[in-house]
């Protein structure tokens, strides 16, 4: 049943209705028109009554007021359970001094300070109703909790001594009212650890705070376990949020621990953030992967540039190039053997080295052959000024030119022989003439 309290003085209208507002109007057969006719001249429209009948509490609960006043839910509950006056009316029969004295006695008692305010280990205070169910726990539940505390306090007050009248002083009552308002705010607030119960910088299991300030507003371990089990997203993954690696399952973590012993080329790039933290154990594995893509890029050479039109006899004309090729091949083979002895290489790496060596030697052979063709072209009179002459034309013209030169040589040699014979004849004739004259 809702709590209806009215004060004669110092009434705060902005919080009274919210603090005592019920979930529904309990009496479903209540005649609103008859009540309105008794208080007002004209009844309200039926639509207003319908919406007022089904009016709910605001969800989520409103933030508590931070100002000191007499309209907090705890004080309303205190006033509602206080002894009523002789006239049988509401709380309006009490004066302001009596109300302040009751609140001061409630907050100043030793039992209340130990069990309700200053005892953070109390299970009743830790397991707050608002924290257990923050959606539908209204002020009636908070008033019920205060009433239970008040009943136990009144039972213990009979045995204890009465408080001194000096506590009804104005300054003390103001501070006690402010503490009462803060106490009401603490009971109505929601702990942020319920929304996100996992710590960001603690890799171990979640522990409750050790300080009394934080423990007073933190839920118990049972409530944390129940919230973790009930939530579908609860998993041990968020417990390692401080690490740099992404959250993985237990099977993945076991596989990564086994893979750290044997590091291959494929898995190094996948576990690069973790190997950076490890340091020296994975230093040898990081040197291989950056070089392998570069080797593949450099070894990609098209094979359609070979000179298939050149006759096989041209290689016999250039024994120096072939000798250099064989020598460089031996040197590179020795280098590859030394590397193989120093560190075991895979078959792919060996094939890449062989392909790279072959490409270098083939490029050198083509360059030397091109320079030879250019030199031969310059010796042919017909192709001396033709820079775009193909290699086949150069070879044909060179062959014809060589044959012509050889024929010319034979002709000149025969002519030389004839001239030598003529000379010999002339010499012999000259000798005969000298002998005849003598």
Swiss-Prot record:
Residues 314-330 have a biased composition (Basic and acidic residues). Efficient DNA binding requires dimerization with another bHLH protein. Binds DNA as a heterodimer with MAX. Interacts with TAF1C and SPAG9. Interacts with PARP10. Interacts with KDM5A and KDM5B. Interacts (when phosphorylated at Thr-59 and Ser-63) with FBXW7. Interacts with PIM2. Interacts with RIOX1. The heterodimer MYC:MAX interacts with ABI1; the interaction may enhance MYC:MAX transcriptional activity. Interacts with TRIM6. Interacts with NPM1; the binary complex is recruited to the promoter of MYC target genes and enhances their transcription. Interacts with NUP205. The modification Phosphoserine is found at residues 6, 63, 72, 82, 152, 160, 162, 292, 313, 328, 343, 346-347. Residues 353-405 form the bHLH domain. Residues 334-346 have a biased composition (Polar residues). A motif (9aaTAD) lies at residues 101-109. The 9aaTAD motif is a transactivation domain present in a large number of yeast and animal transcription factors. One of its GO terms (cellular component) is nucleolus. Residues 252-264 have a biased composition (Acidic residues). GO terms for biological process: chromatin remodeling; chromosome organization; DNA damage response; G1/S transition of mitotic cell cycle; intracellular iron ion homeostasis; MAPK cascade; negative regulation of cell division; negative regulation of monocyte differentiation. A motif (UBR5-degron) lies at residues 354-363. This is Myc proto-oncogene protein. The gene is MYC. Glycans are attached at residue 59. Residues 208-238 have a biased composition (Low complexity). It comes from Sylvilagus floridanus.
């Amino acid at each position: 049943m809702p709590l209806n309290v009215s004060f004669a003085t110092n009434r705060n209208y902005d919080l009274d209705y919210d603090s005592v507002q019920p979930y529904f109007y309990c009496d479903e057969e209540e005649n609103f028109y008859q009540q309105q006719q008794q208080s007002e001249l004209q009844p309200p429209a039926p639509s207003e009554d319908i919406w007022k009948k089904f009016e709910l509490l605001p969800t989520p609960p409103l933030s508590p007021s931070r100002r000191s006043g007499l309209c907090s839910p705890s004080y309303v509950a205190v006033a509602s359970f206080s002894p009523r006056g002789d006239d049988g009316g509401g709380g309006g029969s009490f004066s302001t001094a009596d109300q302040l004295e009751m609140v001061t006695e409630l907050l100043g008692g030793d039992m209340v300070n130990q069990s309700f305010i200053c005892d953070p280990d109390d299970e009743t205070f830790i397991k707050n109703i608002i924290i257990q169910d923050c959606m539908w726990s209204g002020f009636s539940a908070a008033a019920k909790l205060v009433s239970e505390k008040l009943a136990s306090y009144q039972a213990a007050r009979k045995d204890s001594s009465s408080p001194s009248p000096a506590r009804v002083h104005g300054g003390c009552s103001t501070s006690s009212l402010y503490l009462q308002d803060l106490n009401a705010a603490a009971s109505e607030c929601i702990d942020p650890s319920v929304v996100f119960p996992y710590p960001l910088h603690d890799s171990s299991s979640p522990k409750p705070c050790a300080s009394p300030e934080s423990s007073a507003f933190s839920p118990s371990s049972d409530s944390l376990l129940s919230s973790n089990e009930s939530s579908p997203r609860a998993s041990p993954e968020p417990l390692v949020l401080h690490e740099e690696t992404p959250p993985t399952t237990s099977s993945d973590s076991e596989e990564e621990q086994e893979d750290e012993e044997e590091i291959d080329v494929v898995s190094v790039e996948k576990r690069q953030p973790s190997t950076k933290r490890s340091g020296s154990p994975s230093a040898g594995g990081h040197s291989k992967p950056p070089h392998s893509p570069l080797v593949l890029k450099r070894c990609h050479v098209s094979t359609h540039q070979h000179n298939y039109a050149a006759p096989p006899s041209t290689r016999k004309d250039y024994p120096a190039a072939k000798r250099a090729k064989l020598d460089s091949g031996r040197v590179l083979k020795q280098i590859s053997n030394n590397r193989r002895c120093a560190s075991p290489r895979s078959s792919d790496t060996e094939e890449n080295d062989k392909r790279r060596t072959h490409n270098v030697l083939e490029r050198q052979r083509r360059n030397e052959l091109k320079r030879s063709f250019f030199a031969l072209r310059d010796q042919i009179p017909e192709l001396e000024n033709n820079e775009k002459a193909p290699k086949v034309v150069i070879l044909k013209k060179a062959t014809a030119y060589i044959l012509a030169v050889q024929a010319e040589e034979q002709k000149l040699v025969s002519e030389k022989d004839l001239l030598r014979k003529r000379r010999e004849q002339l010499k012999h004739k000259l000798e005969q003439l000298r002998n005849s004259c003598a």
